[in-house]
Swiss-Prot record:
The gene is Rplp2. Pfam families: Ribosomal_60s. The modification N-acetylmethionine is found at residue 1. The modification Phosphoserine is found at residues 19, 79, 86, 102, 105. This is Large ribosomal subunit protein P2.
């Protein structure tokens, strides 16, 4: 992704055909080392293409990907509601879940992926 972003920065900055040297210069400016193999792959794929057309094609492809809405799950016919005696057990399970969540958040030092 960093190579594509650097290529786009160079192209939008007026360089219609950025070279590996141009992209390395952009990456070096923010302290990122460039992998020549990946860099050359990005350049060979994007070389000579109109950036606006590539972006439009990407947007079209992303539009066809499902965006993960909630799936409705209905209860099976004839299934009974839980008995009233199971309510304390459910509350106890929630306490256990909350305790486990707090332990998990310590693993990522408070920086969760979806926070």
């Amino acid at each position: 992704m960093r190579y594509v972003a650097s290529y786009l920065l160079a192209a939008l900055g007026g360089n219609s055909n950025p070279s590996a040297k141009d992209i390395k210069k952009i990456l070096d400016s923010v302290g990122i080392e460039a992998d020549d193999e990946r860099l050359n792959k990005v350049i060979s794929e994007l070389n000579g293409k109109n950036i606006e057309d590539v972006i439009a094609q990407g947007v079209g492809k992303l539009a066809s990907v499902p965006a993960g809405g909630a799936v409705a799950v209905s209860a099976a016919p004839g299934s009974a509601a839980p008995a009233a005696g199971s309510a304390p057990a459910a509350a106890e399970e929630k306490k256990d879940e909350k305790k486990e969540e707090s332990e998990e958040s310590d693993d990522d030092m408070g920086f969760g992926l979806f926070d």
